[in-house]
Amino acid sequence: MNQVARGAGAKRYADAKAALAGVVADGQTLAVGGFGLCGIPEALIAALRDSAVSGLTVISNNAGVDGFGLGQLLATRQIRKMISSYVGENKEFERQYLAGELELEFNPQGTLAERLRAGGAGIPAFYTATGYGTIVAYGKETREFDGKHYVLETALQADVALIKAWRADTAGNLVFRKTARNFNPACAMAGRVCIAEVEEIVELGAIDPDQVHLPGIYIDRLVLNATPEKRIEQRTVRQGDK
């Protein structure tokens, strides 16, 4: 158990600011769950913005949108480097990268997920055929197995993981809700310290063990956000009859 954990009944913190206190610092690497705006730790990201920590390297599928999610940290210039898969939804992300103001390490989406999973499992590196012969493979070791070419990808680990779940018990056992699970479990396992933002906290034993998606051994701190905004990333409506 990480040194910041205080026991099963003491993982809950009063708010996101308190949950981050003594854990986040300048220059750290963070793994942040979410896919677009789905399953992002909204309150923790906002508290991180208010903390004014800077020089961060952030591992996340994307960087939210302008003014919401991780986009807030781009606007305040708290992020030095992104390790991610998708840029297009955030204009400030795109602008900073093209202007040379933000370092960016592109990853195919599946490769990013596997690098996080490997980091959590203690696997230092793995071979994948994805990206061979493209700019993704530049500067990386390649090998041929059974007539097929592969790229060596290294595992990802983070100083702190910030994740979002639907329900937790007081020991930190988590249940995710549908597609909001996405990168969250992998981020949690890859983080040396993991802080989970949840919509409901119940007593130990209230969650059927067979329904636990992520065991509490991976969770160091919990914070309740019972009414997240859950902003819709792309609203699409049916065209009316002409």
UniProtKB/Swiss-Prot annotation:
<dbReference type="GO" id="GO:0008260">
    <property type="term" value="F:succinyl-CoA:3-oxo-acid CoA-transferase activity"/>
</dbReference>
<feature type="binding site">
    <location>
        <begin position="33"/>
        <end position="39"/>
    </location>
    <ligand>
        <name>CoA</name>
    </ligand>
</feature>
<dbReference type="InterPro" id="IPR037171">
    <property type="entry name" value="NagB/RpiA_transferase-like"/>
</dbReference>
<dbReference type="InterPro" id="IPR012792">
    <property type="entry name" value="3-oxoacid_CoA-transf_A"/>
</dbReference>
<keyword id="KW-0448">Lipopolysaccharide biosynthesis</keyword>
<comment type="similarity">
    <text>Belongs to the 3-oxoacid CoA-transferase subunit A family.</text>
</comment>
<comment type="pathway">
    <text>Bacterial outer membrane biogenesis; lipopolysaccharide biosynthesis.</text>
</comment>
<dbReference type="InterPro" id="IPR004165">
    <property type="entry name" value="CoA_trans_fam_I"/>
</dbReference>
<comment type="subunit">
    <text>Heterodimer of a subunit A and a subunit B.</text>
</comment>
<protein>
    <recommendedName>
        <fullName>Succinyl-CoA:3-ketoacid coenzyme A transferase subunit A</fullName>
        <ecNumber>2.8.3.5</ecNumber>
    </recommendedName>
</protein>
<dbReference type="Pfam" id="PF01144">
    <property type="entry name" value="CoA_trans"/>
</dbReference>
<dbReference type="InterPro" id="IPR004163">
    <property type="entry name" value="CoA_transf_BS"/>
</dbReference>
<dbReference type="GO" id="GO:0009103">
    <property type="term" value="P:lipopolysaccharide biosynthetic process"/>
</dbReference>
<keyword id="KW-0808">Transferase</keyword>
